[in-house]
Amino acid sequence: MHKRSLGGLALATVVTIAAGAPLAAQRLRAVEAGVGGALTVARHTMAGVEVGAGYRPGGQSRIALALDAGSEDGQAAARAQLTAQFLVTPNARRGTGVYGGIGVAVAGRRRSPGRGYLALLLGLEAAPGRRGGWYAELGLAGGARLAAGWRGRWFQP
């Protein structure tokens, strides 16, 4: 009886380890780059272009940096946002993926001091498990922010 228990335990251990290997292989790591437009509506409205970069270490997380440059009340303005994001379906190769994020943002314009904010966002993106596609974000960071564009992804083994 004792040998059977040990044999069953060994078999269960092997099955558990073997089942975990495909799961680890499905964890997509990626480097991302994007370009688009951004609009921030607050006391002053800023409209401009956005460039972004992101890193997905695997699982459901992404670290993203977005840099916006444009115009606010006729003055040159810039904005930077760094967020930690949670992707609901990071491996989806079809359909739309949903993600949310929290982080920090800093915004400034010519002849005016910069301002720092807590940043919250909710986003949609085309098939996050594919090499690229559109994205759209709605966020709060010193006002309402809308951004949309195209994001490319380079997956790593």
Where are these regions (language model features)?
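Cleavable N-terminal export/targeting peptides
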Residues: 1-28, 157
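A generic structural micro-environment signature
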Residues: 7, 12-17, 41, 45, ...
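Short glycine/proline- and aromatic-enriched beta-strand/turn motifs that initiate or cap beta-hairpins
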Residues: 21-79, 86, 151-157
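Glycine-centered flexibility sites
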Residues: 36, 48, 101-105, 123, ...
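Residues that cap or initiate secondary-structure elements
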Residues: 41, 90-92, 108-110, 142, ...
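Gram-negative (and chloroplast) outer-membrane scaffold detector with strong preference
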Residues: 52-115, 119-128
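Predominantly the C-terminal beta-signal and adjacent terminal strand-loop region
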Residues: 60-63, 115-157
